Amino acid sequence: DFSEQKFDAVFVCVDTPKGNNTTLLNKVLGEINEYIGNNTPVCCKSTSTPKYYGNAEETFTNIRVLHSPEYLSSNNNIEKFQNQTFCIVGGEESACRLVTSVFCSRLKKLTLENIHTTDIRTAALVKYSENFYLGMKVTLFNELYEIHKRQGCESTFDEFRVLSGADPRIGTSHTQVPGWDGKFGWGGHCLDKDNYEFMNFSESPLVEFIVNLNNTHRGKTHEHSKLAASQQEGEEANS
């Protein structure tokens, strides 16, 4: 029973699987709302839609629901969290200030200058927009991969992408083709589920087009794998 205890803030970090499955997040927020309450700021790091967080803010009235988008990958995530250089917190203003003070006191590279506060729906939309931008960048360089081949360039594509990324406005992140997983297009846990959900709630023709184009790029992976396997079988048969 936590009802008699006072918490400065509570942080929630649970998975929200593809399909905007917020079952676990709802369960956790419901229990915190019931058993902790006390108008406690509850900072959620889980990705979900602006609509979800707007509704959560209104539904769980014994707590103050906040959203702070997470930007970690599975590699070195603890170290990356400890060394993050910016942070966004969305929700009721005084609760945001309390949570930002917690972050500043414990994370050495965060200051009041690089922590940004806003409303909860904006914070949620920022995460989706950034992941869509990164996915779109991957899509662009997958298209450039084919254009580079068709134009008869003497450089390798890796040389080409590094040259393109020499302009600091572009950079080389999310330009490797095939990607780190050896496949075309973008995949992974976050880009896949977040851009799928963004397509569903944004009602944007551009988002739908890029997601569908990425599905085409991902399909090439299987075609190339089959071709490589077929070529290998032919070589083995001729040896």
Region spans (language model):
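Structural/interface elements that position substrates and couple domains in central-metabolism enzymes
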Residues: 1-239
